[in-house]
């Protein structure tokens, strides 16, 4: 079973449509939920297929950041889940920038959670090892089981 979930705060100074647009640069979601936490809206976007990450897959190659992406993705594996964060303001202009902490993105980071039976298989598809910036392999997208 596959579940991809993206969570982002929408602060009072932000436009929810701009945050959705920033996320859409990297992720095609099937379902959207919003909940309120005080004055902050929390967007929760979900998909049940790894195909929802095809834009993310393409951007990693276009920006030539496979090595750093692999590091962040591998570091984020816990059990059958991969968790990582990206900079919200960079995402708003279509640039993918990983962050280690929510504090590195002044308006809050965009948080990704990918649940898959074998998370390393997903990492190998999204961000394979490289030699001199060239991927050592190009795995097909893992099946949505």
From Swiss-Prot:
Q: Which Pfam families match?
A: RNA_binding
Superkingdom, according to UniProt?
Archaea
Membrane-crossing ranges are none
Question: What InterPro entries does the annotation carry?
Answer: PAB1135-like, Ribosomal_uL5_dom_sf
The family line of this record is: Belongs to the UPF0201 family.
- PANTHER family given in the database record: UPF0201 PROTEIN TK1335
The record's section on HAMAP family has: UPF0201 (MF_01112)
Q: What is this protein called?
A: UPF0201 protein LS215_1276
